[in-house]
Amino acid sequence: MAVNMKNIEEVLESELRISEHEAKLFVLIVYKGKVNTEMISKMLHWSIDEADRVAKSLVNRGMVIDITKSEYESLHPRFAVINRYRRRCEENNIIFKKNTKVDNIGMLLEGPYNNARIK
């Protein structure tokens, strides 16, 4: 499957072994920039507890940083997805090597990431 903006969440889930909610939130943070749990809750129609739980999960996976107790920001997408892919390889005792789909995810999200931060 080729990676494009229509299937990016699905590819994030399959290649990085993250949940559907984690993929949705990661893409949201890349597109919006710094967000807090209240904003996440409103934009994704989740409870604040769910928003906080999923954001903390992305922090633990090395894709997002917590700026404050309730504010989150994505790492640069190329770094974030490679970082997660490397961790996934370690978790599954797989040799870390180039993965074109993972590289393409980072490249596709780089434009929206930059646009959200140049406001």
Please give the residue ranges for each predicted region:
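Short alpha-helical "packing" element that flanks the helix-turn-helix/winged-helix DNA-binding module
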Residues: 22-29
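Short, cationic-aromatic polyanion-contact patches
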Residues: 11-22, 36, 66-89
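Short helix-capping/hinge SLiMs at alpha-helix to coil transitions
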Residues: 16, 29-32
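Short acidic, hydrophobic short linear motifs in intrinsically disordered regions
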Residues: 33-43
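Short amphipathic alpha-helical interaction segments
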Residues: 45-60
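Short, Lys/Arg-enriched N-terminal segment that forms or immediately precedes the first helix
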Residues: 1-15
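Amphipathic alpha-helical dimerization/coiled-coil segments
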Residues: 84-119
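Alpha-helix C-caps/helix-loop-beta hinges
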Residues: 32, 61-62
